[in-house]
Amino acid sequence: MNMALTLFTNTALASLLVLIAFWLPQLNTYSEKASPYECGFDPMGSARLPFSMKFFLVAITFLLFDLEIALLLPLPWASHTDNLTTMLTMALLLISLLAASLAYEWTEKGLEWTE
């Protein structure tokens, strides 16, 4: 009951904050806020240069793989558990997911810079 109440309270509070942020209007919209700022000087060039989507996708892929590898870090401490088969099954499942996602990225040419 305590856990359910905590989850409900957290969900309700997060939803309330999202709704407030969504429905609150942008009160002060000045042109100065939308202009680029370069240490008080006039901008040398356009601050709205197109961003490389390939770089963005590789960065997101790196973050996902980094998160999955971070999930593997507690495995040495988990090996001291009484239920070793469950731990090994979960570790194998996590490593399989990591290998399958790497294979998918490789076949979709998501790791190549030259294209």
Swiss-Prot record:
It catalyses: a ubiquinone + NADH + 5 H(+)(in) = a ubiquinol + NAD(+) + 4 H(+)(out). GO terms for cellular component: mitochondrial inner membrane; NADH dehydrogenase complex. It is found in: Mitochondrion inner membrane. Keywords: Electron transport, Membrane, Mitochondrion, Mitochondrion inner membrane, NAD, Respiratory chain, Translocase, Transmembrane, Transmembrane helix, Transport, Ubiquinone. It comes from the Eukaryota. Belongs to the complex I subunit 3 family. This is NADH-ubiquinone oxidoreductase chain 3. The lineage of its organism: Eukaryota, Metazoa, Chordata, Craniata, Vertebrata.
